[in-house]
């Protein structure tokens, strides 16, 4: 077991973890993003390991006026107890792709690629990264190979004559980054759309055309459970209903 990572999603405020009675270094404190813990130094391979998680949803910081912060009130169904969503324990190689970030540039017909590599070892990371893209029709574009000698890699990938994304033609590209280093292989896949969001004289533009926002506020609308969906199917229902009513965006308090 070279590396292990725990991901805790959909919990409120402060989390800490113990493995076999030993506290894992650090703690996570956020209201909206997943909490991650590196357990590599604490788990014993081949043995039963006891994992204890403590969630503290008490007010950690005063972020509101008259208790009206929408990220932490009973009025918006955001003061949850414990963990509502996903808990995952993932075994990882010593070297792996931590983040693949894609930023489209339709003016130059490119996508700017940023790759962050994580390593549990002390030696420098070296190897190669293979970057591949499929267009919205499923056609494979030219591969790009990049030499790896650092934990952060940035490069530009050409998207000639891109099929642009908007709400009426939601063209989606699929990118895959594959890291080969030290006899190990790791891959990460992300989707992206070629689009540009700007403003012109305080008017929103998408791909140099006027954009009209038609949306609603989703807030405290789950009375049976008291919290938003914790699975993909639940969110598909929410977004599909909004789309069927002609909306193109949602705003959330919960």
Stretches with model-predicted labels:
Residues 4-5, 13-18, 25-29, 62, ...:
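Active-site-adjacent substrate/metal-binding segments within catalytic domains
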Residues 91-122:
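Surface beta-strand/loop "capping" patches
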Residues 110-147, 153-155:
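Beta-strand-rich binding/interaction modules
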């Amino acid at each position: 077991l070279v590396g292990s990572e725990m991901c805790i999603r959909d919990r409120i405020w402060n989390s800490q973890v113990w493995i076999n009675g030993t506290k894992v270094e650090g703690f996570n404190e956020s209201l909206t993003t997943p909490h991650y813990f590196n357990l590599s130094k604490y788990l014993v391979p081949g043995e039963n390991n006891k994992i204890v998680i403590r969630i503290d949803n008490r007010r950690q910081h005063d972020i509101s006026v008259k208790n009206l912060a929408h990220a932490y009130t009973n009025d918006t169904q955001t003061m949850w107890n414990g963990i509502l969503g996903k808990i995952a324990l993932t075994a990882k190689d010593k070297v792996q792709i931590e983040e693949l970030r894609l930023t489209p540039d339709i003016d130059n017909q490119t996508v700017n690629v940023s790759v962050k590599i994580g390593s549990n070892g002390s030696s420098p990371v070296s190897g190669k990264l293979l970057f591949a893209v499929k267009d919205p029709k499923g056609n494979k574009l030219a591969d790009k190979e990049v030499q790896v000698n650092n934990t952060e890699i940035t490069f530009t990938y050409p998207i000639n004559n891109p099929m642009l994304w908007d709400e009426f033609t939601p063209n989606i590209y699929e990118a895959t980054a594959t890291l080969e280093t030290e006899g190990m292989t790791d891959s990460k896949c992300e989707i992206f759309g070629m689009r540009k969001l700007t403003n012109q004289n305080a008017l929103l533009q998408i791909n140099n055309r006027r954009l009209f926002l038609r949306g609603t506020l989703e807030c405290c609308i789950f009375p049976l459970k008291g919290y938003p969906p914790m699975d993909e199917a639940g969110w598909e229902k929410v977004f599909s209903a909004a789309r069927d009513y002609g909306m193109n965006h949602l705003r959330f308090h919960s």
